[in-house]
Swiss-Prot record:
It is found in: Host cytoplasm. GO terms for cellular component: host cell cytoplasm. Its main location: host cell. Sequence repeats lie at residues 161-164, 165-168, 169-172, 173-176, 177-180, 181-184, 185-188, 189-192, 193-196, 197-200, 201-204, 205-208, 209-212. This is Protein B602L. Belongs to the asfivirus B602L family. Keywords: Host cytoplasm, Late protein, Repeat. Induction: Expressed in the late phase of the viral replicative cycle. The keyword Repeat applies.
Amino acid sequence: MAEFNIDELLKNVLEDPSTEISEETLKQLYQKTNPYKQFKNDSRVAFCSFTNLREQYIRRLIMTSFIGYVFKALQEWMPSYSKPTHTTKTLLSELITLVDTLKQETNDVPSESVVNTLLSIADNCKTQTQKSTEAKTTIDSFLREHFVFDPNLHAQSAYTCASTCASTCASTCASTCADTNVDTCTDTCASTCADTNVDTCASTCADTCASTEYTDLMDPERIPLHIMQKTLNVPNELQADIDAITQTRQGYRAAAHILQNIELHQSIKHMLENPKAFKPILFNTKITRYLSQHIPPQDTFYKWNYYIEDNYEELRAATESIYPEKPDLEFAFIIYDVVDSSSNQQKIDEFYYKYKDQIFSEVSSIQLGNWTLLGSFKANRERYNYFNQNNEIIKRILDRHEEDLKIGKEILRNTIYHKKAKNIQETGPDAPGLSIYNSTFHTDSGIKGLLSFKELKNLEKASGNIKKAREYDFIDDCEEKIKQLLSKENLTPDEKSQLEKTKKQLENALEMLNVPDDTIRVDMWVNNNNKLEKEILYTKAEL
């Protein structure tokens, strides 16, 4: 059988799309793209066990990370309306201060046109801020309804069962009567209320509520707040404090726990005396803590799983058309051989080179009698070996994944760089204390290390002008290179040549700083008494 040539097949299809492809060619094409190549059969049988719980974990991991990203993006999002920029209350106060300053400097009220202009700008700023707040509030409400577990919405306490049953039955009957004819409604309401409300709900409520009326289901050791608030005999001087403590479950539990644990009294006293020292420690900004504050309810997972299962084929087809991964890359494994564990690595290396032309994918060593984690751990990734052309499909997938990560990081870095430049142009450089604040409160969260200190410094030096900031970066690199070369005692000829070249580049870069943004510099050489002198002209740039 002739060797299959996929390039020739593609060429023929492009030249004549109506050309029929034989079944044998399709089989060869499938075998070429199928990573599960058949290995040499063996009469021995290996007994093994495996679990596929990773798929369920990946779904939850994706859901958790997606929810965390959405809430984080909402915090950083600034909606766009008629104006692309949105001014905060800080600028509003600055405008008011400007009006007061003008009054003081001129000892007179500014002209009516100036005042009206400033007030108009201030009013627009206030309007934009209000619109942004309203939009964020609406989106936050939507996200919390679907993505945040709220026990008050998803699990009612037992002592509210009676009122819940009554209101549910009444509303159900009312809505049913509105949509159904009278005869049917009468029978439905009667049977529903009789069966559900009397038999089920009444008995359940009676038994449960009787035993839990004076018990907090979420904290059985303590009396529920609604009971305590009715029975407490509080002196007038303590009434305000007791009301504040018993207003929420969290406050009551915290106070009760502190009172019952004497060893905490001194520590709590120190914490209240120095809250700034304790707050960064107890309320850290790690991403794990942030994600744990947004726990998706179980019904969201159910709805998401239902959506995937109901549209599984369509989702696979869409994923296949968007991404390079094939949808038939399911979980699978093959056992090649069994070797003595005392010389495991040596045997594996020998196996690699002996069967390198037949092995399609990477080979991993698995200790018999022990569970082996197959996840994408660093130790597992370092063991991957590629020896032949048969594994090109999987290798391309992994290489593409690594390349996408690099490209995505560079795109994100450029986006941050341009947004930071725009921010400096609009509001000026960062406040002096911002770097200290970020180092104190944002050490483990957010984007770290994408922009260097030198880049930020040069952006501020250039007042947000990206062209000049790049030139400052180049000047710093040249000066650093010259400094390194001059620090050496004896330079090689190549290093001397590099030093002279770098000095010229530095000189040209310093001259380019004076070139306006809307012009192009043209160097001209003029013969002056048999001596060439450089003159510089500027021409208008076409934007």
